[in-house]
Amino acid sequence: MNIKATINLTDTMLNKSIIDANKSVCELAKEFSFDYSEHEAGDKNAVSCRYPDGNIAKVTFYKAKTRGDKRISITKLKHYAQAGDVVTLKQSKEAIEILIND
């Protein structure tokens, strides 16, 4: 089954690189052995990902060190997206495909 997560980007998400993990992100994280409900603050899991142009990056599912908020980090995102865009993370074998406004 192909799991997808969608994120509606805001200025804060892009400029501070802090993205809250919504319900769809939490479901996708489980497919990569990271269940937010079973992890403690500071825990993280990095997964290889790919942009449509073939560029390799990294998606990190993590719980913030201080309060344990559920978060996700996507490297190189500023180069591909801007505030108002919708980012789709799509499960693809052992990696994640990153799609912008798809």
What are these regions (language model features)?
Residues M1-D102:
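Acidic, low-complexity intrinsically disordered regions
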